[in-house]
Amino acid sequence: MPQGGYLAFYENPAEGFADLRGEEAWVGFQGGPFRYYLIPGPLEEALARYVRLTGLPPMPPRWVLGFHYARWGLRTREEVEERVAGFLERGLPLRAVHLDIDYMRGYRVFTVDEDRYPDLEGLVRAFREKGVRTVLLLDPGVKAEKGFPPYEEGLREGLFCRLPSGEVVRGPVWPGLAAFPDFTDPKVRAWWGEKLAGFLRMGVAGFWLDMNEPALFAAWGEPTLPPSARHALEGQGGDHRLAHNLYGLLMARASWEGFRKHAPQGRPFLLTRAGHAGVQRYAWAWTGDVESTWEGLKATLRALLGLSLSGVYFVGSDIGGFSGNPSPELYLRWFQMAALTPFFRLHAARWTKRREPWRLGEEVL
């Protein structure tokens, strides 16, 4: 091997195992192709060649590099307006607000709760006039409810993952039992992209793709689709053992292609929780639900560096951690770190204390 080292990329989405201890390295996969690339050279050169192989990230919208605000648990339009006003009235830069699942009707994807979020289009427009873009969360699970149009379409057109018996896979997530689009099928990706058109016409500036490992609420077993779930896999066919790691990547691809089709004049912004090699072609990433502790901050730094070394350069975290109540010092240090990352967002769980900067005292502000 060359003196400068090398980068090894195994092009296999199946579950893998690696043992890098000692003098030898061992890598194995539970199925899939045995196809790999060895890229020699110093780290920066090898990484550049890897990114050219898996795909370069596109130029982002300029506003995305500014400060973003989000919070799970903003139950009404008025709560969101109050938070945005709090930043603007204090002269604190705010470029985007992210709406979590609270804006949906019963957590049904592609819906808006008109009672709690009336005239969402007007809200998006009002924020835009103040220089604040709106980003909406989307989950892949489609509520398995008779009469719900996306579910009925999915059944009629064969868009959902199925068991070997032919039965649609259903699993518990936010709206209750849900079915899961098979993003390994080009037909499904096109359908999903069409579903974004209405939001884009409203002026929505980006989408936050969550729960797309895909994740399920499971009391036991793996919190995802069963290994036997069937996927199209671009016409080759196969089960979830090959499709699992591709699911988030292909949901991002479907969203990107829909964005480009229905808002061709703009640069898409997508944020994803899950992905695979090449996801940087479509989406940014954040580190997910990290605990609000010093160890959580250290783990976040490791994750951000690891993502960057995997070609996913546009990354960030939930400032202060997602779950818990950071001390003023931890909050401030996390903020300082996050200001140097491409994705700069304050976000937290609904059970945590409010943590807008002015809530933690004058010294922090």
Region spans (language model):
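Catalytic-domain carbohydrate-binding cleft regions of carbohydrate-active enzymes
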Residues: 1-365
